[in-house]
Amino acid sequence: MRMTAIISEYNPFHNGHLYQAKIARQETGADLIVAIMSGTFTQRGEPAFTDKWTRAQAAVASGEIDLVLELPFYFAVQRADRFALGGVTIAETIGAESLSFGSECGQLEPFIEAAAENQEATPRYQELMQEGLARGLSSATAASHAFREMTTTLDLTTPNNTLGYYYARAASTITLHTTKRIGSGYHDLSTGDIMSATAIRAYHATHHSLIGLPELTAETLRNAVFASFEPYYPFIRHRLLTTPLDDLMQFNGIDSSLAPRLIEGARKNETFDNFMTAVKTRRYTRTSLQRVLIYLLTSSKSSEFENIAFDRIDYVRPLAFNDNGRLALREIKQRIPVISTFEKHPWLIKESHVTAAYAVPLARYDRLEEHRRFAHFAGSVSK
């Protein structure tokens, strides 16, 4: 079967995602589309809009996604280059012939050229990075500014282009394909037929209804429990105010400069938004801080990440699939173990802890039993 992969979060799956999957299927000649989707927490360090099982089921219900595989926590809640490398590693390991991604650019050649230039290895890039860091910028912001100074063929200040660049850097055996993003941009909160996931979540927060989704996807999500960061803040605050300083610095991303700042912010602020306003700086951006807080919430220590190889995976885990996806899983099993039931794999044990950290603040105790969850089988889904 000719397989095209899409690295995704589907937070939630919306009309723009549906458009991308349709175009990817048409232009790559794919027999099936497999989504490699982050789980309960996202790349930007946010609790997913709803749990991974429901999001995966909603994607398959659209009729364009045949199989959803989980992007493990260690790959998912990461800066862009590691997120991309982890996703590409899975796509190539399962035998996908193509990797499709949305981009603001919409043309593949600039990504190939930028990746081949490898500007990150040049002295000029390193000089610009150091200048940015010296001005108090975060690593991600300093990198964005450096790329802006050096690159003329590709705008790497936009989120989808940035991920596309790192996909191109990571790709070894897979053919790349890009679809121009249509409709709202990532941070655009305007409403319409094709809205950003950010706008859909914001609209739901104020109107308590879902718009901008395919009909069958919306139906799947109708009775879901939706998350925001606010219910998690009391748990994060408790840990910040009760953990000794030296122990706090064992968590991934927390150093001697950040730890006191987090403690002071937690001591003085009763809401998550006020806490973030007090703590974030040019160096500590909201996104990087959110990832740190997720590491804290999930008890993820720096030592856990020391031996993570982002270019290697020894299992895949399906979250949802249809008849076409089931056929694909048979082929994938010839390449790599497919874990559909819970096993005592260290990463799956971690996933159970991560799922508990996601579920308890939402009082979703029915979602605690990760070891009893099976991939959702949708059967035949009409397109």
Swiss-Prot record:
GO biological process: tRNA modification
Family annotation (InterPro entries): Rossmann-like_a/b/a_fold, tRNA(Met)_cyd_acetate_ligase
Reactions catalysed: cytidine(34) in elongator tRNA(Met) + acetate + ATP = N(4)-acetylcytidine(34) in elongator tRNA(Met) + AMP + diphosphate
Residues involved in ATP binding: 7-20, 102, 160, 181-182
Pfam families from the UniProt entry: HIGH_NTase1
GO molecular function: ATP binding; ligase activity, forming carbon-nitrogen bonds; tRNA binding
Keywords: ATP-binding, Cytoplasm, Ligase, Nucleotide-binding, RNA-binding, tRNA processing, tRNA-binding
EC number: 6.3.4.-
Location(s) in or outside the cell: Cytoplasm
One GO CC term, this protein: cytoplasm
Top enzyme category: ligase
Role, per record: Catalyzes the formation of N(4)-acetylcytidine (ac(4)C) at the wobble position of elongator tRNA(Met), using acetate and ATP as substrates. First activates an acetate ion to form acetyladenylate (Ac-AMP) and then transfers the acetyl group to tRNA to form ac(4)C34.
Homology family: Belongs to the TmcAL family.
Name the UniProt record assigns to this protein: tRNA(Met) cytidine acetate ligase
Species in which this protein is naturally found: Exiguobacterium sibiricum (strain DSM 17290 / CCUG 55495 / CIP 109462 / JCM 13490 / 255-15)
Gene: tmcAL
